[in-house]
Amino acid sequence: MKMSFSKSCLSVLLLSFCLVLISAEIAIAQKSIVADHPVNFRVEPPSWWAGMNNPELQLLVYGLDIASTDVNFSYPGITLKKKHLAENPNYMFLDLELAPDLKPGSFAIKFMRGKKAAYSYNYVIAERAPGSAMRKGFGREDVVYLLMPDRFANGDPSNDNMPGMLETANRSNPVGRHGGDIAGIRKHLDYIEELGMTAIWINPLLENNNPAYSYHGYAITDFYKIDPRFGTNSDYVALVNDAHAKGLKVIKDMIFNHCGINHWFINDLPM
């Protein structure tokens, strides 16, 4: 009985010691992940608009040990209602309330440790385009042209292979990237219009920086940036303007229930 009790105690002590070691290794690894992370500080959404119908805005903030900082900012018409912390101390969520008379502009959000700003972010409140709230979506009266941008038309071969992108174009690979882009779509708007279409549904154009199998666009790694192999955010705006000038609606394909394996927060999850 004595021997059995001693063995049990020893087992518990060994298990406890192992758990302490594992916990320490996880903590060290977590800090190492953030220190080596390509995105050491981030605020999403990176900007917003004045005059939105919903007065609530939540910001996701990421930075090393951001949870230990105090938030400091001052801007007329914006109030910090609540700060949420996650299990991971590298995350913070800010609930902001926007006044109906909020004016466009910018302000510094400072994340303070004592009297020193550990991080600072210049947040832009843009002016909303006139008539934005009156936009009409697509309906049963529309004839929709669905296209996959990588497979549609290559209007700018110079962006087929871009610095920092893990996959390069290879038209001989049936599941690889083939080089289609926003420029190719813009050059073929007349073709789509002549078919009798009234709307274009474009598969996601946002960044899919994965080593393979992401030509379809549904493995997003940045929800706020057009994939450079398709073009730029400005190119997308120009595409929409060109389409509208021809009476074509543009349906933005958004994916909210998953992301690509190389999305920045996958290596350091909030929970």
Where are these regions (language model features)?
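Bacterial N-terminal signal peptides that target proteins for export
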Residues: 2-14
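Sec/Tat signal peptide C-region and signal peptidase I cleavage site
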Residues: 25-29
